[in-house]
Design a protein with these regions (language model features):
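N-terminal positioning helix adjacent to the helix-turn-helix/winged-helix DNA-binding module
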Residues: 3-10, 57, 149
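Secondary-structure edge/capping motif, primarily at the C-terminal ends of alpha-helices
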Residues: 65-68, 96-103, 135, 160-168
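Helix-turn-helix
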Residues: 6, 14, 18-48, 52
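C-terminal peripheral helix-coil segments that are non-catalytic and often amphipathic
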Residues: 162-207
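Amphipathic alpha-helical segments used for helix-helix packing
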Residues: 90-111
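Amphipathic alpha-helical packing segments from all-alpha helical-bundle domains
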Residues: 109-136, 147-162, 178-189
C-alpha cells in the first residue's frame, strides 16, 4: 500500500469513528506517524482527502452497477447488487451520516452528487422496466408511480445509516444486515406473485 492509499485508509477509519468535524489533516498525519507536510504533499487539504474517499465510493458503486450490463437481469441479481451497494455506503458511512452538512461544506461533492442523480435515476428506471417485462414487477397503478418509488428508495438508502447511528449504534440486532433486509423489503408490495415467490426463495426477510 503506497503513502496515498495509507492516508486514505487511515482517514476513512478516523472519519467513520469520530465524524468529519473531529478529524483534521493534522490528526490523520499524527495517527500515521508522518509530518503534516508529508501528508499535504499528497492531499493539500482535508477537502481533497474527503473528495478522494467520495470518488472511491462512487467507483465501488459504479463497478457494481456495471456488472448489471454484463448479465441477464433478474430479481436475484438486482437484489445482490443492491446489497453490495448498501455495503459500500456503510464502508464510507461518514459521508452518509452527515450527507447534508458535507454537501453544504464541500461544493465539489454536492455538484458531483447532483450531476449523477438523473443518470442514476434513468438506470434504475431501465432496470424496473426489464423486471416488469419479465413479469416480476407490477405495472404502474397510477402515473409516475415508479418515479415516486425511485425517489423514496433514494431517500431510504441515503439516510438509513444516519438513522441507524442515532437509534441503534450500540444494538447489534439492528446492524447492517437488518437494515439491508429492511430496505429490500421495501420492494415487496411492488412484486407480482411470481416476483414474490422469487424474492422469498433467496432472501430471509426482515429479522
Amino acid at each position: 500500500m503506497n503513502r496515498k492509499e495509507q492516508i486514505l485508509e487511515k482517514s476513512l477509519l478516523l472519519l467513520n469513528e469520530r465524524g468529519i468535524e473531529n478529524v483534521s489533516a493534522k490528526i490523520v498525519a499524527a495517527e500515521l506517524g508522518i509530518s503534516d507536510g508529508n501528508l499535504r504533499y499528497h492531499y493539500r487539504t482535508k477537502e481533497d482527502i474527503i473528495y478522494a474517499l467520495y470518488a472511491r465510493l462512487l467507483e465501488d458503486i459504479k463497478q457494481n452497477i456495471l456488472k448489471l450490463d454484463e448479465e441477464e437481469i433478474d430479481l436475484k441479481i438486482i437484489i445482490h447488487t443492491i446489497t453490495l451497494v448498501l455495503g459500500s455506503l456503510h464502508r464510507y458511512k461518514f459521508l452518509m451520516i452527515d450527507i447534508v452538512g458535507i454537501m453544504r461544506k464541500f461544493p465539489s461533492i454536492q455538484a458531483s452528487y447532483q450531476a449523477l442523480y438523473n443518470p442514476r435515476k434513468q438506470k434504475i428506471k431501465e432496470l424496473i422496466q426489464k423486471i416488469m417485462d419479465a413479469g416480476v414487477l407490477k405495472k404502474e397503478t397510477f402515473p409516475n408511480q415508479y418515479d415516486y418509488f425511485i425517489l423514496q428508495f433514494y431517500t431510504l438508502t441515503d439516510f438509513w445509516i444516519s438513522e441507524s447511528e442515532i437509534l441503534y449504534r450500540d444494538n447489534t440486532r439492528y446492524g447492517v444486515s437488518f437494515h439491508i433486509n429492511l430496505i429490500l423489503s421495501f420492494i415487496v408490495p411492488y412484486l407480482t406473485e411470481k416476483g414474490l415467490e422469487e424474492f422469498q426463495s433467496f432472501t430471509k426477510g426482515v429479522k
